[in-house]
Each structure stands twice: as C-alpha cells, then as structure tokens.
Amino acid sequence: MVWAPLRRRRAVTLLPVPGPCALGRHTVHTERLLLYTPETQLDLLAAIAAGSDAEAQRWLGMRGEEVVADARLRETLLRMRPGDNDRKIRRELLVAFEPGTEAAELLVGVRRDNGRYAAALQLDHTTGQTGGWLAPHGRGQGLGAELFAAGALLGHSHFGMDTVHAGTEATNAACRGALLRAGFVPAEGPPTHTLRDGREIDSTWFRHGSGPVARCRAAGVAQSRV
C-alpha cells in the first residue's frame, strides 16, 4: 500500500472498455487489472473497502470515518463485481457517481479474470504523487507492481506528467518491491510522513520517469507538468 455497471456475463459487459477517456473519467488497464473512475456509489464504496482491513490500515493509516469498518460488509463488497444487482445492495449504492473537481483522482480496480473488485488507485495531479491498495484476495500475487505501473501510466499518458512520485513506509518491503518492479526508482524525500490518523512513520520515496508524455481529453484544461 502507498499513500497517496449478479451475473458474471452481465458484469463483464458493463465494465468500461479501455480506450479514449470521457471528460472527467479515466480508464487504464494492465495484464490482470482494469481500473476506472467509479461509475456508481457501489464502485466507490468497494474501492474504499479494498483498503479498510486491519492489515491495509497498518500502512495506510486512514481516519476511522474514511474506512468501511464492518468486516462482513467489506467481505460482501469484495466478493462482488460491477453490475451485480444483489438484493442486499441498497438502492442508493446503484446511483451514478459523478467525479468532483478534487486534486486527487480515484480509480477503482477489478480483476480481469473474474471481474471482482480488487483495488484502488489514486493520483494527485497537483503533486504528481500516486498511491493505491489491493483487496485481501489480490495480495501476494504480483498485482501490486501492476497497480503502481497503472499509476505511472495514468500520470504520464493521461495527465502529461514527466515524473510520477510515490512514498511508502520504510519497513513495507512488499510495497517497496512492487514499486521497483513497476519501474520506479529510489528518490529523495522527507524522512518521515504523517498518516491521516496522526501516526508519524519513517518514509521512503520513489519516482517514475517517462519518455514522451500525453494528456487525454478527460484531464481537462492544461496543468503544470510535475
């Protein structure tokens, strides 16, 4: 972890198709992950649930109101696929999600093999910093490297960033390894970082450079390149 549309056939057909991005909405993919701007409130809640368990929060350090605290609800959400219409799902969760104007982009990730919610990716397009997390069922399978490679791709090819940055706790060997496998290299940065829950931890930093960069139409007006 770093800071920073109940049937299988139906779920697959409702997934965003990789290609040109629409205004305010982005889609990126790797070999095993499809990541996209949430389409529904369910997508958004599943993205949050993916990083709400105790193991993830050891590293992420979100505030209590920023996580899905109920373990049974987390498990239910992370067994689902976009487009599922389970009777247990509240109707308001199927309402469309409209992206805001915040500096940070949030993408929800699903596995391409079974369509299950599996990850979340963030990119702050003012600082060029990316971050993300995997659901418990997606950890230990090399998906972290794909997730961070997607973060670099989003920064370089969607927002025109020359450099994408990432930071993690110094003792988080799994995250450091995933960043290195994704093509990030060690970089200078503050020796400590304060998590959102107030904990101060030792930090280590990475950067990802690129050749030609580009901006997709979903990125809106031009911004300074980081």
Specify the residue positions occupied by each region the protein language model found.
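Conserved GNAT acetyl-CoA-binding A-motif
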Residues: 157-167
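GNAT-family acyltransferases
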Residues: 1-137, 158, 199-226
